[in-house]
Amino acid sequence: MHIEKIELQNFRNYNNLELEFSKNVNLILGKNAQGKTNLLEAVYLTAIGRSFRTSKDLDLIKFSENNAIVKVWAEKELNSTTVEISIKRKGEKSSEKFIKKDRKNVTKTSQLLKNILIVIFSPEDLKIVKDEPEKRRKFIDRELSQISPKYYNSLSNYKKSLLQRNTYLKEDNLEPSIIDLWDIQLAKYGAEVIFLRKDFIKKLSEYSAQIHSGITGDKEKLDIIYEPNVEIKESLSEQEDFIYRELKNSFKTDSRNRNTSVGPHRDDISFIVNDIDMRNFGSQGQQRTCALSLKLAELNLIKEKTDEDAILLLDDVMSELDADRQEFLIDTMKNNQLFITTTELDQNIKDKFDEIKIFYIENGTLI
């Protein structure tokens, strides 16, 4: 799988831009704050339907303009696809998004999933091991949603029910019968989320362990462990019943705190290397090796589930890795289309790949 071409209009700091890409490596060079990451963001947007940097589509429209357009042409093993996303300004604080896939209107973002497979690796991802649990949950949600529309739908329904329950908990004179409506929904969708996360993290751990062993020369053993907020049961129905009972048991606490304390929105994952929890006791080098292993495992898992090689976006991450980790990353990525942003041309990268295109970006313009 690879992206052949992109067109931008009024996207971030770009007026109009049209680029044709290499199937192999695309180096995007430029000083800081010139628009390199904006270009990766545009590519990512057409794959996932949303930005990896902001939850506000309005931020994607160039200042003083009323609309932004991103269009890509992508080639898969058996067919080609086009995705066009238009964002229109509605007043000062809101916007409207329109998506077309192969010239047909898309009404739900989930309809884009599995169309263009993509993995983003940025300096922020290197902090995932030591960051707060919310960042690790977002990582799991983002990657699992991309290969499992069922997970995306279950998670979306869970979040909607959670928001409604939490909103109601902030009111006075709560009615147990109304809370029960949300408890039923949270139990159902929460059980689905937990079971899908469990299987995904197990497989992710297996791939990560193999990669981590290769990076460290078999000196370290990595385990990624799922830490659910509730006990995991044998069957989906048992899990649903258990979450429902736990929600009932926590009602007094939740009503006092005006927040839901039970469910997968409080899950976490741990990174254990040689029986040591890297979240609290890992060195920066160990934490970065875990993060790199995790990202490369994503690519392997996507390949297993879809039989496609995902596109990899490397956003100013090469300079954050030492020479050995850079070498391992480059050697592993021979079958993937790469987009690499950097401030300086790395001769090592240039020498490693046969087909490479270099783009120089200055203030949203190709030079």
Regions inferred by a protein language model and the residue ranges of each:
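Structural recognition of the conserved hydrophobic beta-strand(s) that form the central parallel beta-sheet
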Residues: 72, 337-344
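Nucleotide-state sensing region of NTPase/ATPase domains
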Residues: 48-127, 133-135, 144-147, 151, ...
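Conserved lysine of the Walker
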Residues: 36
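An accessory alpha-helical subdomain
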Residues: 127-217, 227
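Walker B catalytic acidic pair
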Residues: 315-317
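Post-Walker A helix-loop "phosphate-sensing" segment adjacent to the P-loop in P-loop NTPases
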Residues: 45-57, 297-305
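Conserved NTPase motor "head" modules and their coupling/switch loops across ABC/AAA+ ATPases, GTPases
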Residues: 1-31, 178-188, 192-311, 320, ...
